[in-house]
Amino acid sequence: MLKIAMIGCGAIGASVLELLHGDSDVVVDRVITVPEARDRTEIAVARWAPRARVLEVLAADDAPDLVVECAGHGAIAAHVVPALERGIPCVVTSVGALSAPGMAQLLEQAARRGKTQVQLLSGAIGGIDALAAARVGGLDSVVYTGRKPPMAWKGTPAEAVCDLDSLTVAHCIFDGSAEQAAQLYPKNANVAATLSLAGLGLKRTQVQLFADPGVSENVHHVAAHGAFGSFELTMRGRPLAANPKTSALTVYSVVRALLNRGRALVI
């Protein structure tokens, strides 16, 4: 049995608990949350993981088999780095956090000090295995194009680029590097950061973002070229019922990673 400490129990974390409910190989027996979210966390835990303890920090002498982060960027430094330094393997969903200068190196160094490993999840995008394999032979270009309905860009710099309320055709709100995209649109950085880390890096991965009234879901398109040949991938992601801003595939990515840790045969 694999015993897991989960950081965060919002839309992603609660959905993970639900999907793992009743699994005898993988058990979430610790859930780490912040004080202001404790009440709703305890409700979700009571329903889907009644034997789990709700904590605000992992004690220094507490050593789960695995830590999974489902809490957002701030949890990386607060919880994941200390766990890695203590030798506890970790799984990270908030890959966009690694767009910040030095964050990827911080995680890698913590894992090296703890003689363990941190796994970055593919989340809402597919093809990461192919892209990472292609990098071995040499990549020439990776271009990511993201499309969302105009209203999904409310509260972002896109509001200064165009009138989101009156768009009738797709409008490009950003065209540049993944590094620049992460700075301007940090809440939309996970997919671009994941592709960058698997492929050419933040500076060389190209990103185009569109506010598109013709789509009702998040559309991801990846085009990669290199010594291996080329590939193109288009995904139309449905949102999580509990949180329209979160991809359902992100939750499934977490569950798959955890189940793989507890099973003898994985793919």
Swiss-Prot record:
Keywords, sorted A to Z: NAD, NADP, Oxidoreductase, Pyridine nucleotide biosynthesis
GO molecular function: aspartate dehydrogenase activity; NAD binding; NADP binding; oxidoreductase activity, acting on the CH-NH2 group of donors, NAD or NADP as acceptor
GO biological process: NAD biosynthetic process
Active-site residues, as the UniProt record annotates them: 220
Record: residues binding NAD(+): 124, 190
Pfam annotation, one family: NAD_binding_3
Pathway involvement of the protein, from the record: Cofactor biosynthesis; NAD(+) biosynthesis; iminoaspartate from L-aspartate (dehydrogenase route): step 1/1
Record's keyword annotation contains NADP: yes
Keyword Oxidoreductase appears in the UniProt entry: yes
EC numbers, comma separated: 1.4.1.21
UniProt record similarity statement: Belongs to the L-aspartate dehydrogenase family.
Listed HAMAP family: NadX
Additional notes on this entry: The iminoaspartate product is unstable in aqueous solution and can decompose to oxaloacetate and ammonia.
Summary of the function given for this chain in its UniProt record: Specifically catalyzes the NAD or NADP-dependent dehydrogenation of L-aspartate to iminoaspartate.
Protein name (database record): L-aspartate dehydrogenase
Natural source organism: Polaromonas sp. (strain JS666 / ATCC BAA-500)
Organism taxonomic ancestry: Bacteria, Pseudomonadati, Pseudomonadota, Betaproteobacteria, Burkholderiales
